[in-house]
Design a protein with these regions (language model features):
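N-terminal secretory signal peptides and thylakoid transit peptides that target proteins
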Residues: 1-17
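Feature for soluble, non-membrane regions of globular proteins
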Residues: 4, 143-144, 411
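Histidine-centered copper-binding motifs that mark active-site loops
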Residues: 11-16, 26-285, 292, 298, ...
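Extracellular/periplasmic low-complexity linear segments
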Residues: 41, 310-321, 369-380
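Active-site pocket scaffolds in enzymes
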Residues: 117-119, 125-130, 134, 265-276, ...
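Short, surface-exposed ligand- or partner-binding patches at beta-edge/loop junctions that are enriched
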Residues: 156-161, 298-309, 461-472
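Catalytic P-loop NTP-binding/switch module of NTPases
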Residues: 351
Length: 486
């Protein structure tokens, strides 16, 4: 059966049981939730194909990125989907701290778009990670992202962020991995697994969203890994692999497990563990990423999502079950591989609790009764503090150079993942309980009728950006607000 929000909160308090929660990640040993997959939609069984990799050279990564609609095959069906450079997902970008990323984005869609480098701590100004840029159909825009020399390594990704079209474009296929390298781990191989979902009509068109799905956040009936349905992976016993897993779903929560194999967590988002932490499950809200080590044991296994109850709006919006299913299969056969070398300890992340707090704020997710003309399409209007997003309004003004404490509350009956652009958060309290470890995130799940407390370091990157719910139908409907740092 799927885990409930209440169980997740209770587990978050049980550090002695090896639970990894910290607002977004969850693992637990020996629980009766490892139910077999019940999903059967579509074809599968192809070998996993990883996206093409492009790397920076001499400190620069230059990319020509074309957003367009193309015909491809998904789950054995010809489909007309959205692509970056003709593929789903787009290329995997690999860079180093201190690098510059230059992207020429050409919009060949029939709606406006733009680009967000989710997870990068870079300038939000001008042609940087600026969510207020709008690139009309037929237009070209040149982006430049300058990574600081001390940018943390980790798993990031890129996707559109033009308000009002984000959910449709991500659901349609516009996303790709962005890896900031810098921490070396002895492994047999590394894999990038971009998990997404989509719904297709019988003739291969993307299913348009309905009003109840805006309320809950749509979940596709096909869950894909690197654009494939239930691909196959293979390895030898004794090998150790590094898996970079991205939840690129519009609204779906992923409760990942790989029964029969040995999993260790290196980090979530750009946060990192000092030493690998053994886990049985990892919970990724939409937008979260996991950096995992998989030590291979002989036999067949399934990479599964075990199901998560994210709440709902009752009769108005239905339930919010992110259901269980098989994402991929793994066959571990052949001769035993030589034992890999030890994983080196990693540098400690600075603890923001050691700095003085320059300001405190409380921010609330809200869903108010709407009208037929409102963003919620006659049901509920999502927002923050009772207001829907307005690009001409500044909701929070912050002085550059300080650390602030933000209390994020969620009085609604469903979970909301909170994402702050540019400035990473350190989770210090969830469910009224302190978080002991230094836990850095850029997406923090706020449970229904719950709250979390975070510290945000505004030491650099002045400019204007946003925070929002990463259930992207909610974001498009108004659950976003602006913050100006200066």
């Amino acid at each position: 059966m799927p885990i409930t929000r209440r169980q997740a909160l209770q587990l978050g308090m049980l550090g002695g049981l090896g639970v990894v929660v910290g607002g977004v990640g969850l693992s637990q040993t020996g629980l009766p939730w490892l139910a077999p997959s019940t999903s059967s939609a579509g074809a599968g069984g192809e070998s996993l194909v990883e996206p093409e990799v492009v790397r920076s050279r001499d400190g620069v990564l230059r990319v020509e990125l074309v957003a367009t609609r193309r015909e491809t095959t998904i789950a054995g069906q010809r489909a007309r989907v959205l692509t970056y450079n003709g593929t789903v997902p787009g290329q995997t970008w690999r860079v180093q701290p201190g690098d510059r990323i230059e992207v020429r984005l050409r919009n060949e869609l029939d709606t406006p778009t733009n680009l967000h480098t989710h997870g990068l701590a870079v300038s939000p100004r001008d042609n940087g990670d600026n969510p207020f840029v709008s690139i009309d159909p037929g237009q070209v825009f040149d982006y430049r992202f300058d990574l600081p020399e001390d940018h943390p390594p980790g798993v990031s990704w890129y996707h559109p962020h033009r308000h009002g079209t984000v959910a449709d474009q991500l659901f349609g296929g516009l996303y790709g991995a962005l890896i900031v390298e810098g921490d070396r781990v002895p492994v047999s191989r590394e894999r990038v697994l971009v998990v997404s979902d989509i719904s297709l009509t019988g003739d291969g068109q993307i299913v348009p969203v309905a009003a109840p799905e805006v309320m809950m956040g749509r979940e596709g009936n096909l869950v894909l890994v690197n654009g494939q349905h239930r691909p196959q992976l293979s390895a030898r016993p004794g090998q150790r692999e590094r898996w970079r897993v991205i939840n690129a779903c519009t609204s779906r929560y992923l409760r990942l497990a790989l029964p029969g194999q040995h999993l260790e967590l290196l980090g979530i988002d750009t946060g990192r563990e000092l030493t690998p932490r053994e886990v049985q499950e990892v919970l990724l809200a939409p937008g979260n990423r996991a950096d995992l080590l998989v030590s291979m044991r002989a036999g067949s296994s399934e990479l599964r999502t075990l199901g998560y109850d994210r709440g709902g709006m009752g009769m108005m919006g239905g339930g919010g079950l992110s259901g269980p299913g098989t994402l991929a299969t793994l066959a571990v056969t052949g001769a035993e591989a030589a034992a890999p070398g030890p994983v080196p300890d990693r540098l400690a992340v600075p603890d923001l609790r050691e700095k003085s707090v320059a300001g405190r704020r409380e921010i609330a997710f809200t869903m108010t009764m709407g009208s037929m003309m409102g963003p919620g399409r006659g049901m509920m209007d999502p927002g923050f503090d009772g207001r829907a997003f307005d690009a001409d309004r500044i909701d929070q003004r912050v002085s550059v150079g300080g650390v602030e404490e933000w209390l994020i509350t969620n009085p609604t009956p469903m979970d909301h993942p909170f994402h702050l652009h540019v400035w990473p958060m350190q989770l210090v309290e969830t469910g009224g309980q302190p978080v002991r470890e230094v836990t850095r995130r850029d997406v923090v799940n706020v449970p229904a009728r719950g709250r979390v407390r975070v510290l945000v370091d505004f030491a650099r990157h002045p400019g204007r950006s946003v925070y929002h719910c990463h259930i992207l139908d909610h974001e498009d409907a108004g659950m976003m607000a602006s913050v100006e740092v200066g």
